[in-house]
Amino acid sequence: VEDRPSRSESEHISPLLGTTTLAYLDRILKDGDMVGVTLGLTLYNIVHADYTVDKAVQCCFVPVLGGVGETYAELHANRLAEEFARKFRSDFLPFYAPALFSDAGVLQGFKKEPSVRKVFSLFERLDVVLFSIGVPQGDYSTVLRMKYIDEKILKDFSEQGAVGDIGLQYFDINGSP
């Protein structure tokens, strides 16, 4: 675990954490594994760490949330899943869907689509999930910067007790949603 040091946004993750994470994955991933990938700057920095994977692994990297948008595409789950797959010389399955829906009815209809059901069915088979913990503070919030949410929503989450998020799922000090 690394707390965010007071350096620039692009330097917030140490090179050692990135290479250590990749070395760990290199050691534990095996053929047939399903690897879920979320979003964000930490995962971006990990996948771009200076580390060469020893052997190709026939696993599949799957975004665990959608990610279509106009800003910071390199931090979206689809792009990160693809980059992890490239790094490990593996496969990835894209999930071209919004990360958030403004209308619950649209979301319910979307979940009925065969291609979406296929991706959702893989979530139950995940062996590993790569995620980072976001903070609901404007200066550090990647999801705010990506325009998934606005400052008012972020402030509302904080006022309701949110201390962090994992894959856009906010939680309080006790880990409860």
PLM region spans:
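N-terminal active-site beta-alpha-beta segment that forms phosphate/nucleotide-binding
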Residues: V1-S102
